[in-house]
Amino acid sequence: MNDDIKTVTVYPTTLELTTPTKSANGSNDDYDPHQHRELKNPTTNFQTFAHFLKASVGTGVLAMPSAFAHAGYVNGTLLTLIIGSLALYCLHILIKCMYILCKRQRVPYVSFSQAMNLGLKQGPPWLRCLAPIAVPFVDGFLAFYHFGICCVYVVFIAESIKQLVDEYLVVWDVRIHMCIIIVPLLLIYSIKNLKLLAPFSSAANLLLLVGFGIILYYIFEELPPLSERDPFVAAGKLPTFFGTVLFALEAVGVILAIEENMATPKSFVGPCGILNSGMSIVLGLYVLLGFFGYWKYGNESEGSITLNIPQSEIPAQVVKVFFAITTWISYALQGYVTAHILWDKYLAKRFKETRQTFYELIFRAIIVLLTFGCAVAIPDLSVFLSLVGSFCLSILGLIFPVLLQICVQYTEGYGPFRIKLIINLLLLCFGIFGGVVGTYVSILDIIAVYK
């Protein structure tokens, strides 16, 4: 560590980062960061698992049949599993590198942005110049990405309510429905810790289960011959598929936040841990809904499969209510990351401790109003889903974790024939290529919508 670095603020606590001290045998092996975490409201394994499922199964899963229409059912199945496996691998290496850096610094926890800062300082010399901008850069991307998700959620909830109100009461503009949901959003977003949010996530998962059951009922009703669907499609459509799937699968900020808040973080990354078990369920669900949804509706698959099922039937309307409720809960979970970063790391220290609770609630209310404002200004915000997935998540979920591992392994070596470096460089190229191409195609799609 450079001598000019004295302290680093790690939310929710402040940790002193000094030159790592070593044990008598000259190593840091005796220090286990997990045993030194002190949390005010730690979550149990079950609560963490509920949060993981809710964070990973959002509105993006409803777009999977449409994503498969841009890939074909064979390509879609294989590529979803490949992208999901790569995303899972990158989450593993990210959490592992953060743990290694904690051991080296002998601190209980470092955030994603601090890990990038420390890793770049210990990595190849030509990368060390990037260390000073790592913290604001990573924090900015995470806060912006999860803020963007919340904007999309406002649109989704309002549109779901509008469809029901239009059917039974009166036809209003979607912006009026956005105004109506401000108060419920303010209420759920005022819950400031994950332990209190856990019962909401558990309830949301039950509603999701019932909702998916109803959707699958409609899907399996009079399935057409599979021969009417394309196993493969033109390669030009794949970038849109890539962005949609990555957006649906990755919630890196929430995943890191729930791991940080665990009472037993060792249970998160084990072979049968929460990360592997949860991602297996999520991947299975995404492939199931994507494959059979595309089989049923083909190229007519809408951006949300709830628009394909009969709109006037009671079960279909129940699905919309359930997904509106679960998305309302997801708003608090995804928005937690934005508030967690901006308030705890940058704003809280500007106020007296006795007034921080009040001002944090004000700050959270401002975030809700900003997401509302963005949704009102651009009600077609859902068209940006693939763009956000391709750009932000290729950086946060693929490129940064791989770059961090390259830096962390620099002093220890990359193994025989530098095999670890080669693997990481291949993943880096995949992330850059997917991000650039996906972003380009998504921008073209947005231009086409607004022509």
From Swiss-Prot:
Per the record, membrane topology reads:
Multi-pass membrane protein
Q: What does this protein do?
A: Amino acid transporter which has pH-dependent electrogenic transport activity for alanine, glycine and proline. Plays a role in positive regulation of growth by directly or indirectly modulating the effects of the TOR signaling pathway. Required in enterocytes for the efficient recovery of gut epithelium following the cytoplasmic purge response to bacterial infection. Acts cell-autonomously to promote the retrograde transport of amino acids into the intestinal epithelium.
Tell me the superkingdom of the source.
Eukaryota
Which positions does UniProt annotate with glycan attachment? Answer: N75, N299
Segments crossing the lipid bilayer: 49-69, 81-101, 137-157, 168-188, 200-220, 238-258, 273-293, 321-341, 358-378, 383-403, 421-441
Tell me what induces its expression: In the midgut by intestinal bacterial infection; probably in response to the cytoplasmic purge response to infection by enterocytes.
Tissues showing expression: Expressed in the proximal and distal regions of the midgut; expressed in enterocytes and progenitor cells. Expression increases in response to intestinal bacterial infection and spreads further into the midgut, eventually covering the entire midgut.
Which compartments is it annotated to reside in? Cell membrane; Late endosome membrane; Lysosome membrane; Basal cell membrane
Q: Spell out the molecular function terms from Gene Ontology.
A: amino acid transmembrane transporter activity; L-amino acid transmembrane transporter activity
Q: Which UniProt keywords apply?
A: Amino-acid transport, Cell membrane, Endosome, Glycoprotein, Growth regulation, Lysosome, Membrane, Transmembrane, Transmembrane helix, Transport
Which Gene Ontology cellular-component terms appear in the entry? Answer: basal labyrinth; basal plasma membrane; late endosome membrane; lysosomal membrane; organelle membrane; plasma membrane; vacuolar membrane
Name of protein: Proton-coupled amino acid transporter-like protein acs
| Extracellular topological domain residue ranges | 70-80, 158-167, 221-237, 294-320, 379-382, 442-451
Report the PANTHER family cross-referenced here.
AMINO ACID TRANSPORTER, AMINO ACID TRANSPORTER TRANSMEMBRANE DOMAIN-CONTAINING PROTEIN-RELATED
